[in-house]
């Protein structure tokens, strides 16, 4: 999977990566899944898009660790998530945006499943990889959810090397060695701490079977012999501009959560790349449209002008807003269909811009023309599950109540007085009650 690239002056590069029998043109994005499925989309809808690969976080499916159905039932990961046979999958220990968890140990990391916090050992993770047979895999890694201390940093690197070595040895002993490619997890640490990783690539013969590098945040300076490997980023992106900046630093593959986050919020993505010519009014353009907004109640335009996705070809903004107001599930389906298509077109434009040698200039124009963040949503998205919410601190209520009291202020006051009167009567009854005397026999 070595990458042969055409680069821009900043470091952005365009190439192709072969995964099994599929050629992935980079830069590209892998679509994150939730509990093994693409949110809001059925498998037949997913097949309509040319999605390079699906990202599956194993912690989504390990409610009972080794007794979880994903490990006890027959079949590979393709059968579990009902993905097409030609659709590559990337298996990783955690979700793209994992919830905070306790620090890892020498042989395990802590994960957050639908049934609570669990310890995922490297032995169990290797067993899952050998059973599920994904095309791509990120080994178990100690990625802290808060800044690590000085003593922990060397341990993070040591665990990455040891756990990756154990996975490679297990793959080598089976037929999966030629079908499952490994992305080495590079910790987000200063280069001085990464020396053991660089030594691993220089001295260990197993390093020849590393297919790429996975970064959780910043891209560290790399030795010359590692520059040709594909680079994947799992960091959290808040805007498309952050993605463009990341590609400028040399990242080839992005795993963005913002597609589903925008859909959940009821936002239709409307940005494009390369960007359009600057508005004569000198005002910045929105990255998306909040479809809860009342201004779309009678708007008979498609979600995005010129878009040819299934949603924009058949439906209008007013209809999508009506579905959102009615809390119809199809509202989020239509938005997700459009947003995935918009992201696919976004990356097609990125590759074309790099090939033409205009990428850095187009990024500068994009920053000038578009707003830096998505519009605030005025509605409620689908109800969230416990494993989607940060429960480590006191957080605002994520799921609004399904009903509210219709009592007037006067009715509430009368009800409160009535409850207070009942409490007073119970106290008086208790005080008047005398326990029978006990007589000695």
Curated annotation (Swiss-Prot):
Broad class of where this protein is predominantly found:
cytoplasm
The superkingdom of the source organism is Eukaryota
Sorted alphabetically, the Gene Ontology BP terms of this entry are: maintenance of translational fidelity; tRNA-guanine transglycosylation
Q: Which GO CC terms are listed, alphabetically? A: cytoplasm
Q: Which key words are in the record?
A: Cytoplasm, Metal-binding, tRNA processing, Zinc
Q: Name one Pfam family in it.
A: TGT
Write down the InterPro entries for this protein, in alphabetical order.
QTRTD1, Queuine_tRNA-ribosyltrfase, TGT-like_sf, tRNA_ribo_trans-like
Q: Name one GO molecular function term.
A: tRNA-guanosine(34) queuine transglycosylase activity
Q: Identify its protein family.
A: Belongs to the queuine tRNA-ribosyltransferase family. QTRT2 subfamily.
Free-text function comment from the UniProt entry: Non-catalytic subunit of the queuine tRNA-ribosyltransferase (TGT) that catalyzes the base-exchange of a guanine (G) residue with queuine (Q) at position 34 (anticodon wobble position) in tRNAs with GU(N) anticodons (tRNA-Asp, -Asn, -His and -Tyr), resulting in the hypermodified nucleoside queuosine (7-(((4,5-cis-dihydroxy-2-cyclopenten-1-yl)amino)methyl)-7-deazaguanosine).
**Protein name per Swiss-Prot or TrEMBL:** Queuine tRNA-ribosyltransferase accessory subunit 2
In its UniProt entry, the species of origin is given as Schizosaccharomyces pombe (strain 972 / ATCC 24843) (Fission yeast)
- Gene name, per UniProt, is qtr2
């Amino acid at each position: 999977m070595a990458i042969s690239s055409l680069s821009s002056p900043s470091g952005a590069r365009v190439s192709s990566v072969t995964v099994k029998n599929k050629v992935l043109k980079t830069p590209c994005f892998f679509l994150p899944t939730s509990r093994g499925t693409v949110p809001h989309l059925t498998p037949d809808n997913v097949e309509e898009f040319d999605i390079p690969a699906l990202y599956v976080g194993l912690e989504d499916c390990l409610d009972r660790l080794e007794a979880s159905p994903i490990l006890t039932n027959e079949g590979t990961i393709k059968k579990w998530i009902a993905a097409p046979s030609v659709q590559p999958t990337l298996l990783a220990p955690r979700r793209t945006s994992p919830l905070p968890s306790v620090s890892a140990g020498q042989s395990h990391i802590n994960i957050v499943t639908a049934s609570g916090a669990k310890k995922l050992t490297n032995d169990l993770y290797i067993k899952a990889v050998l059973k599920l047979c994904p095309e791509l895999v990120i080994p178990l890694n100690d990625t802290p959810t808060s800044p690590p201390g000085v003593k922990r940093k060397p341990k993070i690197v040591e665990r990455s090397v040891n756990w990756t070595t154990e996975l490679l040895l297990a793959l080598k002993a089976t037929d999966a060695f030629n079908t499952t490619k490994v992305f080495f997890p590079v910790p987000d640490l200063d280069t001085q701490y990464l020396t053991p990783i660089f030594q691993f690539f220089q001295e260990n013969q197993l390093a020849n079977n590393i297919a790429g590098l996975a970064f959780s945040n910043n891209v560290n300076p790399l030795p010359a012999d590692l520059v040709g490997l594909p680079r994947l980023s799992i960091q959290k992106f808040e805007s498309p501009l952050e993605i463009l900046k990341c590609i400028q630093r040399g990242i080839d593959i992005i795993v963005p959560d913002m597609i589903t986050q925008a859909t959940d919020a009821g936002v239709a993505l409307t940005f494009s790349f390369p960007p359009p010519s600057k508005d004569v009014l000198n005002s910045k353009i929105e990255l998306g449209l909040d479809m809860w907004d009342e201004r779309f109640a009678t708007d008979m335009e498609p979600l995005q002008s010129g878009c040819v996705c299934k949603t924009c070809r058949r439906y209008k903004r007013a209809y999508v807003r009506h579905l959102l107001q009615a809390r119809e599930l199809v509202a989020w389906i239509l938005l997700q269909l459009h947003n995935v298509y918009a992201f696919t077109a976004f990356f097609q434009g990125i590759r074309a811009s790099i090939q033409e040698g205009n990428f850095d200039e187009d990024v500068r124009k994009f920053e000038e023309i578009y707003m830096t963040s998505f519009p605030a949503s005025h509605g409620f998205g689908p109800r969230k599950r416990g494993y989607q919410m940060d429960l480590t601190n006191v957080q605002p209520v994520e799921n609004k109540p399904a009903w509210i009291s219709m009592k007037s202020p006067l009715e509430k006051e009368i009800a409160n007085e009535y409850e207070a009167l009942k409490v007073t009567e119970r106290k008086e009854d208790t005080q008047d009650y005398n326990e029978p005397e006990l007589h000695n026999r």
